[in-house]
A protein has these predicted regions:
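Core nucleotide-handling region used for phosphoryl-transfer chemistry
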Residues: 1-28, 33-38, 42-316
Length: 316
């Protein structure tokens, strides 16, 4: 898939695209959303054959910033927090002939990190130089602008030997929890789909026949207004909307997502908090052959993001 925005299931149906309903019943892979910042891309630049680091600007069509040297980092990011982050990434991330993207969590030396809104608590002080949560791999034949994204769901795909100092100490602490669909028993494997939601999904398909869906342009406006309601803590009341049947259907899909989310679990990850409150995670991403969708509690994180002084404008 191209490097496109991943949507919530309920937002994806506004135009009448019901792909997500069948996707819930497909074999899927789950990954845990990590609330890190900034997003870092690294790997081998197919255009030059050189190792690089950068932000998502490496994919820009025009203002491209692919940092292959320390001098380029200083030129483009000198005097900003990104200078230190990218410099450490250039020095510490293992060289690879592949291309990855991950969320930067912080520098070693602490046991608690709050890169954005969520605080992550590790069981002991992090000894590695940097902490990275990889989530995406890209394939690009000749130019990063043509990169195609694939979810990185394999637990810890990076060999320890690829990120160690000569004395055996580590450069990078990888954070990639193992996510799974709970089957009601103890263990880390669970089910491979949300098949137990089949009756609800079939009901939703029947309900869809009576809904007047909207154009992509209209859907964008609906999303904007729905996000505003969620951020401001307002209840989404279908009867406040001209197309009340569409909003009722949106709420139905949102409830199916909540049921799916209640079945998601993960292991091998740090504890997560918002303030003093322990939470499961920021959420999950469901990956299927039909696409990927976000599974998360929008109300919880929109409020937290909106209240976070690091954000000028939050998006659900």
């Amino acid at each position: 898939m191209k490097n496109t925005h991943i949507e919530h299931p309920e937002d994806s149906i506004l135009t009448g695209d019901l792909t997500v309903l069948d996707a819930f019943l497909m074999v899927c892979l789950l990954s845990v959303k990590i609330d890190g910042a900034p997003a870092i891309v690294w790997g081998t630049n197919p255009a030059t054959g050189n190792f690089f680091v950068g932000t998502k600007s490496v994919f820009n069509k025009k203002k491209i910033r692919i940092c292959e040297t320390q001098e380029q980092i200083i030129e483009w990011y000198g005097g900003t927090p990104l200078e230190e982050i990218l410099s450490c990434c250039l020095c510490n991330l293992p060289h690879t002939d592949r291309i990855f993207q991950g969320d930067f969590i912080g520098f070693g030396g602490e046991s608690e990190y709050t890169p954005n809104t969520i605080t992550y608590q590790f069981p002991s002080v992090v000894q590695e130089e940097i902490i990275m949560a990889p989530h995406t791999e890209y394939v690009a034949k000749s130019d990063l602008r043509d990169a195609v994204a694939y979810p990185l769901c394999k637990y810890n795909p990076f060999p320890a030997s690829a990120a160690t100092n000569p004395d055996g100490s580590y450069f990078v602490k990888w954070v990639q929890p193992k996510a799974y669909i709970w089957d009601g028993a103890y263990g880390e494997y669970g089910k491979d789909s949300f098949a137990e939601l089949r009756d609800l999904i079939n009901f939703a398909k029947v309900r869809a026949t009576g809904v007047e869906f909207v154009s992509p342009k209209e859907a964008a406006q609906y999303k904007k207004e729905l996000n505003a309601c969620i951020r401001e803590g307002e209840t989404v009341n279908p009867y406040d909307w001209e197309n009340s049947d569409l909003i009722k259907f949106w709420l139905l899909i949102k409830s199916i997502k909540a049921d799916a989310l209640s079945l998601c679990r993960y292991a091998h990850g740090p504890n997560a908090y918002i303030g003093q409150d322990r939470i499961d995670s920021e959420g999950y991403v469901m990956h299927t052959e039909s696409g990927s969708w976000k599974l998360g509690n929008r109300e919880l994180f929109s409020h937290a993001n909106f209240a976070n002084s690091k954000f000028v404008c939050a998006s659900a």
